């Protein structure tokens, strides 16, 4: 199994005491070694994995690095999806023994897989949030445009309403004057009709004149009251519309007047 792990680079050994600069240098060296090992592993994978087939060449050429088999990859994928958490050293050792790998191979594979999975998850979350942001931004812009359009409509309707109120105010002024004239005419007509009715009632209330033999007229009282009543009716004459009709006087029998004469 030692030949299978040639592409792996061990991390630097931890020290008990070292300063910050030394730690940074060690970390940089470790990263360069990891990058070089990854490049070497990718190149070996591109050329095709597996041990050298056929009897090529004496022991001079180095053995080709072997990749994980498909069965090993499937087992590792299944374990990773079932257990996203970090595996304990004992679990790593058992899984490595089942797959025929070293525990360090399993640990590094899980570490790389977890990093790629987190990166993809972050990209997925970012894409979802970006889509939501774009949708909200478009909605806000649409609402802003709709607000401006509604404000323009409100201004237009307010102007029309003011114009209509001005027109109705001018019309109401003329109409009020007309209404006052109509009311005045109605009052005058009512007054005149009331006077006519009062005259008619007064005419009907004139007592029957009793002409005595000596030519004096009695109205149920003195002649002064009768004359005063005639003066009230208009200069001692009966109202023309109802009591002053010539036809009625011509038809009225004047027996008593003739007898007196």
UniProtKB/Swiss-Prot annotation:
Tissue specificity statement from the Swiss-Prot or TrEMBL entry: Expressed in roots and panicles.
Chain intervals with Gly residues compositional bias: 46-61
Molecular function GO terms recorded: DNA-binding transcription factor activity, RNA polymerase II-specific; sequence-specific DNA binding
This protein's record includes keyword DNA-binding: yes
Location in the cell: Nucleus
CDD domains, per the entry: homeodomain (cd00086)
Induction trigger: In leaves by drought stress.
BP terms from Gene Ontology: positive regulation of DNA-templated transcription
Chain coiled-coil ranges: none
Leucine-zipper as annotated region, ranges: 120-164
Keyword Transcription (UniProt): yes
Domain of life: Eukaryota
Swiss-Prot/TrEMBL keywords: DNA-binding, Homeobox, Nucleus, Transcription, Transcription regulation
Region of interest (Disordered), ranges: 42-67, 160-188
Protein role: Probable transcription factor.
Protein name, per record: Homeobox-leucine zipper protein HOX24
């Amino acid at each position: 199994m030692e030949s299978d792990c040639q592409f792996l680079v061990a991390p630097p050994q931890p020290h008990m005491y070292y300063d910050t600069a030394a730690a940074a240098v060690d970390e940089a060296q470790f990263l360069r070694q990891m990058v070089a090992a990854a490049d070497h592993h990718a190149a070996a994978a591109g050329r095709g994995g597996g041990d050298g087939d056929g009897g090529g060449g004496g022991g001079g050429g180095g053995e080709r690095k072997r990749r994980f088999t498909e069965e090993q990859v499937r087992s590792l994928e299944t374990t990773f999806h079932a257990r996203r958490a970090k595996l304990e050293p004992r679990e790593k050792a058992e899984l490595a023994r089942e797959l025929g790998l070293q525990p360090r191979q399993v640990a590094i594979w899980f570490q790389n897989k977890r990093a790629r999975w987190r990166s993809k998850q972050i990209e997925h979350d970012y894409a979802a949030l970006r889509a939501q942001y774009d949708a909200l931004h478009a909605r806000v812009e649409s609402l802003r445009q709709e607000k401006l359009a509604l404000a323009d409509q409100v201004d237009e309707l307010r102007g029309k309403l003011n114009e209509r109120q001005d027109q109705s105010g001018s019309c109401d002024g003329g109409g009020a004057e007309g209404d006052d004239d109509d009311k005045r005419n109605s009052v005058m007509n009512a007054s005149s009709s009331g006077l006519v009715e009062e005259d008619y009632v007064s005419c009907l209330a004139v007592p029957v004149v009793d002409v005595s033999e000596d030519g004096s007229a009695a109205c149920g009282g003195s002649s002064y009251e009768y004359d005063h009543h005639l003066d009230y009716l208009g200069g001692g004459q009966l109202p023309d519309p109802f009591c002053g009709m010539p036809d009625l006087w011509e038809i009225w029998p004047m027996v008593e007047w003739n007898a007196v004469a």
